[in-house]
Amino acid sequence: MEVIMRIYAHRGNSSVYPENTMISFRSAVELGADGIETDIHLTKDGVLVITHDEEISRVSDGTGMVKDMTYVELQKFDFGLWKDEKFKGEKIPTLDNLLDLLEGTEMVLNIEIKMGFVLYPGIEEKLLDTIKSRGFMDRVIFSSFNHYSLARLKGLDMSAKVAPLYEEGIFEPYHYARTFGADYIHPYYKSVEQSIIEECHKQGIGVNLWTVNDKETAEYLKSIGADAVITDYPEVLIKSIRS
């Protein structure tokens, strides 16, 4: 039986469009990606917004920390211009904006909770409230490099699907994942081998890998049983993997 490996668009179709913007997410939907991976922060006034960094200067014409600004203040900045003049006018999206886009699809949403340099007290509760109220619990994966945040999510609701992100190798990650009830592992793709994927599957744990940007690597990972790859080039991998 052929292995079906899913393609998740990393911050949308981010190789072509400004990352984590609605134009990037719309492109991923139009391409037929199986899912979207994105990053969540909390504003000063408690709004769940989408951007990768804690500080906005890399991807906007503004400066400052997300945590120190209200949503209205963040709306003053342009989040498309850094990529190209033709994307001028893109604003920072909210989680609700993205959920609105995905509502009529069956796409998976992988939400990375940014809880590294900045801690957002209560972000787990706010995320669960939003995802539940919008009816997305069955197709959201919560991931984070802060595994305490994932354990907290599981403590709040065991039905939440969580996935620890990691870059360096973890010894027997399938056992580690079980310590807080993880449903998936999300390692850097060079940190896994076939035996790890096979053991994860035996224990009912999915393996989704980041960030895979060439079709040769994607084909290899498919051959060893990866469940999904997260990519900046969804169009390239969709054509390769599904051909």
Locate each region found by the language model.
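Phosphate-group recognition and catalysis centered on beta-loop-alpha active-site segments
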Residues: M1-S243
